[in-house]
Amino acid sequence: MVRWLTAGESHGPALVATVEGLPAGIRVSSTDIGAELARRRLGHGRGARMKFEQDEIELLGGLRHGVSLGGPVSVVVRNTEWPKWERVMAPDPIDPAELEGLGRNAPLTRPRPGHADLAGMQKYGFDDARPVLERASARETAARVALGTVARALLRQAYGIEVVSHVVAIGAVEVPPGTPPPTSLAVVDADPVRCADPASSALMVAEIDAAHRDADTLGGIVEVLAYGCPPGLGSYVHGDRRLDARLAGELMGIQAIKGVEFGDGFRTARRRGSVAHDEIEPLEGPGRRVRRASDRAGGVEGGMTTGEPLRVRAAMKPISSLSKPLATIDVATGDPAVAIAQRSDVCAVPAAGVVAEAMVALVLAGAALEKFGGDSVEETRRNYEGYLKSLAVR
């Protein structure tokens, strides 16, 4: 069973992440993790923090000489701004006199609409939004991307699975239906908004610039594809074992994600059954080999992969920290007020795709290991290859 946890606050000393249940023999390094974290900072419309934020990575356990040992893998992502926050966010008790006059320590009593601020204050009994926003911040996704790098390495090395994401909508701009999905991360990452369609990309950039001029924010939709998944990952036996249910849960757990769909998703609900499903056809060659004539289901049927590319989309709402804050109340007085203004992005949809890749990789790694087992990459690859050879219909 693959499990993971993260700890840490946005302006704390570091984020800490641990994943367990992965086999020995995965080749991965801090350089690989650093490259993925750099991808997370990509995208036109990111805020000032992305310009000076550098992720300092330290591998604490689970690897030796760039190869996993089979135990838990732990990663620390240090906060390079910690010296500015070490008194305000000190984990240990601190003399109140040291906090006097520090602007960063001022209570945040005007919760932002759309953010975790107010509900978190109510739930945990805080009179200040600082403890809520520090953990609720999307900064936490850096830890998940770090762990996703390890899972991605396993998928590539043991099963030949590649995970790719791209932006299909920002604001009112959408990629035209039928646009071929990308197969190369390098091509997508070279685009300013990580969009595979150049014409749509230019319109998205213009949309972001217009929102910036209006002191506003934008959401959008990312699509994640996993190429090379064999049939049979996941299960129809129980709801919580269905692969699409597990993927949807982890994607919805990403900050600001408000919806998930597989394949043609909600469009399928508006079609008749005769044009909603993927017909099955034989392939030429030895053995009984088949394929789907289309991929409307997104590579998942009955909670299991079909062997076609896995295709899942996640919808991200506009960022709730605005330069022109919305109406709220001051919880200290109960009076009407405007929400607190925090440094933020205009649009973080391109980065959301990178985070979504990480979560898809972690879920697929867990599903593959449940199916094929193995305490080492070599063993699980051998089991995987044996499974493919034994399929009655491939």
Swiss-Prot record:
Pathway: Metabolic intermediate biosynthesis; chorismate biosynthesis; chorismate from D-erythrose 4-phosphate and phosphoenolpyruvate: step 7/7
Keyword Flavoprotein found: yes
E.C. code: 4.2.3.5
InterPro entries per record: Chorismate_synth, Chorismate_synth_AroC_sf, Chorismate_synthase_CS
Note on how the cofactor is bound: Reduced FMN (FMNH(2)).
A Pfam cross-reference name: Chorismate_synt
Keywords recorded for this protein, A-Z: Amino-acid biosynthesis, Aromatic amino acid biosynthesis, FAD, Flavoprotein, FMN, Lyase, NADP
Catalytic activity as recorded in UniProt: 5-O-(1-carboxyvinyl)-3-phosphoshikimate = chorismate + phosphate
GO molecular function: chorismate synthase activity; FMN binding
Annotated NADP(+) binding sites: 40, 46
GO biological process: amino acid biosynthetic process; aromatic amino acid family biosynthetic process; chorismate biosynthetic process
Reported cofactor(s): FMNH2
List of residues binding FMN: 135-137, 255-256, 302, 317-321, 343
GO CC term, one of those recorded: cytosol
Family listed: Belongs to the chorismate synthase family.
NCBIfam families: aroC (TIGR00033), PRK05382.1 (NF003793)
Alphabetical list of PANTHER family matching this protein: CHORISMATE SYNTHASE
HAMAP family hit by this protein: Chorismate_synth
Job of this protein: This reaction introduces a second double bond into the aromatic ring system.
Subunit and interaction comment: Homotetramer.
Name of the protein in its database record: Chorismate synthase
Species: Parafrankia sp. (strain EAN1pec)
The encoding gene: aroC
